[in-house]
Curated annotation (Swiss-Prot):
The gene is infC. PANTHER family: TRANSLATION INITIATION FACTOR IF-3, TRANSLATION INITIATION FACTOR IF-3, MITOCHONDRIAL. One of its GO terms (cellular component) is cytoplasm. IF-3 binds to the 30S ribosomal subunit and shifts the equilibrium between 70S ribosomes and their 50S and 30S subunits in favor of the free subunits, thus enhancing the availability of 30S subunits on which protein synthesis initiation begins. InterPro entries: T_IF-3_C_sf (IPR036788), T_IF-3_N_sf (IPR036787), Translation_initiation_fac3_CS (IPR019813), Translation_initiation_fac_3 (IPR001288), Translation_initiation_fac_3_C (IPR019815), Translation_initiation_fac_3_N (IPR019814). One of its GO terms (biological process) is ribosome disassembly. GO terms for molecular function: ribosome binding; translation initiation factor activity. Monomer. This is Translation initiation factor IF-3.
């Protein structure tokens, strides 16, 4: 453990007696606006309902506070964060390499792997590698990539077309939505 670790700043939410402004814009537990009230009056209303006074928007003028159950509020905030993380796309780039003289059955197996990756919403780069004299027959590799693209057309789009770099020829497949 490092001696001087930076501590993460958690989103600090002021509640009850931690609110130090003279007046707040108050929202009731059912969401109705009660208007601008003094902090002591807002605290009294919260205690009457056996709930907490939580500062929702500290930058507003006057700050917006809501009467609610603080532990339930924290739970809902955590749930919102988890949902937001789930919605962010986690697409990975998978790469499959094949030789230009691959056997037809081996190519079928590779296509099955590509289909599995695409079903998991991953992007796939299919690379044809040329060795030695195979460089003279690049048209075979190009034809193979186009055949694979036609075969995967119902479930994938080709991104960027055919790319050639050195002794490699590649095509990127992106899953259809």
């Amino acid at each position: 453990m490092a001696r001087y670790e930076k501590q993460e700043k958690k989103d600090f939410v002021r509640k009850n007696e931690q609110i130090r402004v003279p007046q707040v814009r108050l929202i009731d537990s059912d969401g109705t606006m009660l208007g601008v009230k003094s902090v002591t009056e807002a605290l009294y209303l919260a205690k009457q309902q056996e709930l907490d006074l939580v500062e929702i928007s500290p930058t507003a003028e006057p700050p917006v506070c809501k009467i609610l159950d603080y532990s339930k509020y924290l739970y809902e905030q955590g749930k919102k964060l988890k949902d937001a993380k789930k919605k962010t796309a986690k697409t990975a780039m998978k790469e499959l390499r094949i030789k230009s003289r691959i056997a037809s059955h081996d190519l079928e197996v590779k296509i099955k792997h590509i289909e599995d990756f695409l079903k998991r919403k991953d992007m796939v780069r299919l690379v044809v590698v040329f060795h030695g004299r195979e460089n003279q027959h690049r048209d075979l590799g190009e034809q193979m990539l186009h055949d694979v693209a036609k075969r995967l057309e119902p479930i994938a789009n080709v991104e960027g077309g055919l790319q050639v770099t050195g002794n490699r020829m590649s095509m990127i497949f992106v899953p259809k939505n």
